[in-house]
C-alpha cells in the first residue's frame, strides 16, 4: 500500500510538471518496489485480498508501467539505509572523497540519498534504473539535484569507458544473462557477474567498484569470470 501511495504521488508530480513537496518526497522514499511479492500482479489467484490488490494495481498503472513493474519482481529488492551508511563509511576509509560516480541499478536512489554531503558536493552522479516506475521516482527525488538519471538497462546505457571514479550498487543477481553483443569475456555471464565485468570496463584506472552481489560471484564452479576480474582489478 506504501507503493500505491508513492505511485499516486508520482502521478501528481508528473501531471503538474513540478518538484515533489516534502510530504511527497517522504511518500516516494517509502516505495519498496515489487521484489518478492508477485501476488501483486496475479489477479486470478486464490486469495481474494491479493486479487483485489492486483486489480487495483492494474487499474492504476499504464500497460507499459504494469509490465515493467511485474518484470521487476525477481530483483526489485532495495538495500536498507543502515547497510548503505556502512558502505559509505568504508569507502571514506578507503580514501574516496568524491568524483565521477555511477549507480547502475539505482532503484529509487537509496545509495544516493545516503551519500555523505561533502562527497556529494564534490561528485557528479549518473544513476541507471531499468524499472520505469522506480526510475521516474528516482528522477523526481534526485533529478533536480543534478543527477543524470537514465531509465533503462545498464547494458543499453551509452557510457564512456575508463570514466568513473566509483561504481556502487546492489546489483541484480540470478542464473540468467543480458543481451550483450560486445563480445567481451563477461558477455555471456550471469547477470550479477555481467554487472561486475561491465563496471570494470567503465571504471577509470585506480577507481573503486563496490557491489552487493550474490555469493555465487566467488562460489561458482566456473572460474572464468573470477579469472577475468582478477586480471582487471585488485580484489
Regions found by a protein language model. Name each.
Residues 144-154:
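Conserved SAM-binding strand-loop segment of SAM-dependent methyltransferases
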Residues 168-176:
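A short SAM/SAH-binding and catalytic strip from SAM-dependent methyltransferases
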Residues 77-82, 186-193:
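Conserved phosphate-coordination/catalytic loops
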Residues 2-141, 145:
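Class I S-adenosyl-L-methionine
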Residues 130-132, 188-235:
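Conserved Class I SAM-dependent methyltransferase catalytic core
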Residues 13, 176-177:
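Helix N-cap/beta-alpha junction loops of NAD(P)-dependent oxidoreductase domains
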Amino acid at each position: 500500500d506504501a507503493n500505491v501511495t508513492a505511485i499516486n504521488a508520482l502521478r501528481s508530480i508528473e501531471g503538474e510538471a513540478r518538484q515533489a513537496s516534502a510530504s511527497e518526497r517522504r511518500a516516494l522514499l517509502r516505495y519498496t518496489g515489487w521484489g518478492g511479492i508477485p501476488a501483486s500482479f496475479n489477479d486470478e489467484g486464490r486469495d481474494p485480498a491479493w486479487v483485489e490488490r492486483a486489480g487495483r494495481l492494474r487499474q492504476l498503472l499504464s500497460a507499459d508501467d504494469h509490465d515493467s513493474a511485474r518484470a521487476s519482481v525477481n530483483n526489485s529488492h532495495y538495500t536498507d539505509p543502515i547497510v548503505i551508511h556502512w558502505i559509505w563509511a568504508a569507502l571514506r576509509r578507503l580514501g574516496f572523497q568524491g568524483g565521477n560516480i555511477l549507480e547502475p541499478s539505482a532503484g529509487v536512489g537509496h545509495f544516493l540519498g545516503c551519500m555523505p554531503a561533502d562527497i556529494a558536493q564534490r561528485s557528479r552522479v549518473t544513476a541507471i534504473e531499468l524499472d520505469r516506475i522506480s526510475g521516474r521516482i528516482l528522477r523526481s527525488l534526485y533529478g533536480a539535484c543534478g543527477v543524470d538519471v537514465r531509465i533503462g538497462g545498464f547494458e543499453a546505457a551509452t557510457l564512456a569507458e575508463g570514466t568513473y571514479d566509483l561504481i556502487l550498487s546492489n546489483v541484480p543477481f540470478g542464473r540468467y544473462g543480458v543481451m550483450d553483443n560486445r563480445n567481451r569475456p563477461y558477455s555471456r555471464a550471469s547477470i550479477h557477474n555481467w554487472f561486475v565485468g561491465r563496471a570494470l570496463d567503465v571504471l577509470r584506472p585506480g577507481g573503486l567498484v563496490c557491489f552487493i552481489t550474490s555469493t555465487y560471484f566467488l562460489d561458482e564452479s566456473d572460474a572464468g569470470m573470477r579469472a577475468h576480474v582478477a586480471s582487471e582489478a585488485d580484489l
